[in-house]
Regions:
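Bacterial N-terminal signal peptides
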Residues: 6-15
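Positively charged n-region of N-terminal signal peptides that target proteins for export
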Residues: 1-4
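Structural preference for beta-rich elements and adjacent junctions enriched in aromatics
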Residues: 20-355
Length: 355
């Protein structure tokens, strides 16, 4: 019995030791850095670059271009820097400055952060050689169901700077901890992180950590992220207030009573409202909306429907974006358990909320 117990305890210690080896301490910056792209400050020089592996087109093949990616943090931000060298800098591709408009033909730098370290959900941040920003959420461990497992309508607050030279292009990201949701244990935080570079001319993806291409979206998969420990970081309760004011002018002309002249009238409609977002805890966010103006939301893509079935349009209203992945439950096939765009609607049209 004693030998059996000793063997069991040895196995437990081996498992704990093996799991502990998977954790890495994310390096902390030793000084200030300027968000300008090159990442040549002394504080960056002490941060080791990540070990990168070719993800595609040949798993663990030899990359054709040199890449250096570094990730670090301080009390308020997570930083990521990338040096993307290119032997033909004139061939670097970037097509748009519009947010969330990264093209498959663009050179891309991406950071995926599983801030809760739950191996299920993550936040993605991308930039191109032009310095545009793309942000999205990943849900369902990046396993496709009825489409890509992303919500590209999600936006948050963060910054990026990019510079191009005759050696390639260089980028720096700065993501506030207030834009991330996470739980801390007396200032100790665990997060999963994936970083990769996409080189479109050669269809190459180099990635950290080493992830095999066994899944369609393996380079976005939270359960395959490298687990990091951050010390001295505490969850934040940010308050965001977004007011809006709308005004217009209208003119009309109507015949008078005896139809001898036109009476001109004018009106100036005005409308105001605001949205408030407050993080009560790391798991609970309060969203308030006063006189919501959903007309200011990005318009849906036009589609032609020649069937008797309704079209599916993605949710783009920020009010419904917070942790929306919790409701992404499918029922098999094209059916979806919860679809926020149908709130207040029936087959006959809008539903009266009062009166």
């Amino acid at each position: 019995m004693r030998n059996t117990l000793s063997t069991f305890l040895s196995l437990v210690l081996c498992v704990l030791s093996a799991s502990g080896q998977q954790l890495a301490k994310l390096p902390r910056l030793s000084g200030p850095v300027q968000l300008d792209g090159p990442s040549n400050e002394p504080a960056w020089q002490t941060i080791p670059s990540l070990s990168l592996t070719m993800f595609s087109p040949t798993y663990r093949g030899s990359p054709t271009e040199s890449t250096e990616i570094r990730i670090a943090y301080d009390d308020d931000f997570i930083y990521a820097s990338g040096r993307f060298y290119d032997s033909e800098p004139s061939g670097i591709r970037a097509t748009s400055l519009v947010r969330d408009m990264n093209s498959p033909s663009d050179d891309i730098f991406c950071l995926v952060v599983d801030s809760f370290d739950d191996n299920e959900n993550a936040l993605g941040f991308t930039t191109s050689a032009l310095g545009n920003r793309g942000d999205f959420t990943v849900y369902g461990d990046a396993e496709p169901r009825d489409g890509p497992p992303f919500n590209e309508s999600w936006n948050t607050f963060w910054d990026v700077a990019v510079v191009r030279t005759d050696q390639g292009w260089f980028a720096e990201m700065r993501i506030p901890f207030s834009s991330l949701r996470f739980q801390d244990d007396n200032g100790r935080v665990g997060m999963g992180i994936i970083a990769w570079r996409y080189h479109p001319r050669k269809n190459e993806i180099v990635i950290s950590p080493d992830i095999p291409p066994n899944w369609v979206w393996g380079f976005m998969k939270p359960s395959r992220a490298q687990d990091y420990v951050l010390d001295g970081v505490f969850s934040r309760n940010p308050l965001y207030i977004t007011p809006y004011v709308l005004s217009g002018a209208g003119h009309s002309s109507e015949l008078n009573g005896d139809s001898t002249a036109y009476l001109r009238s004018s009106n100036s409609p005005r409308e105001a409202g605001l949205d408030i977002k407050y993080g009560l805890t790391s798991n609970l966010t309060l969203d308030l909306s006063l006189n919501t103006d959903f007309a200011q939301v990005e318009a849906d893509d036009q589609q032609v429907n020649l069937t008797r079935f309704s079209l599916f349009f993605p949710e783009k209203r920020l009010f419904f974006q917070e942790r929306s992945s919790l409701f992404n439950v499918t029922m098999g096939g094209p059916n979806q358990l919860f679809y926020s765009r149908q709130i207040g609607l029936s087959e006959e049209g809008p539903v009266r909320l009062f009166g």
